[in-house]
Amino acid sequence: MSATATQVKLTTSLGTIVVQLNSEKAPLSAANFLKYVKEGFYNGTIFHRVIPGFMVQGGGFDTNFEQKATGAEIQNEADNGLKNKRGTLAMARTNAPHSASSQFFINYKDNSFLDFSGKNASGWGYAVFAEVIEGMDVVDAMAKVPTGNRGHHGDVPKTNIVIEKADVLE
């Protein structure tokens, strides 16, 4: 990714993470994430799903575990050549390939089974749009937080991991 690529700072309750967007290969996903950052949408949201050795997911629930209303779903860009490698961010979605909105996840390891393999229901994969360039130690610390069930959700941190503020770095 180029040195002029947009960077976003996520100030969390466990420390700071800086990510660099790849607007060249993932223009829709990067623009979508940036829109939510600029609107302040992620401020006060939590990382609600932590699976050590796999990924940590956030961007959709507030500290009361209420799901936030989102904008329109976006087209899946997982066929962009970017891979779900350790430290990359990808758009979370439902089983429907083109259902991503605000939620994203950070890969703890190379998760090649999440990569694009074909334009069919099982092959679309998950669109990578950014990578952690600072604070991977913070992401790794999230994996050490005890988790449990909350409502119908599993792997939820017992203590909220909050995105206190998301800022575009100029």
Residue map of PLM features:
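Cyclophilin-like peptidyl-prolyl cis-trans isomerases
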Residues: M1-E170
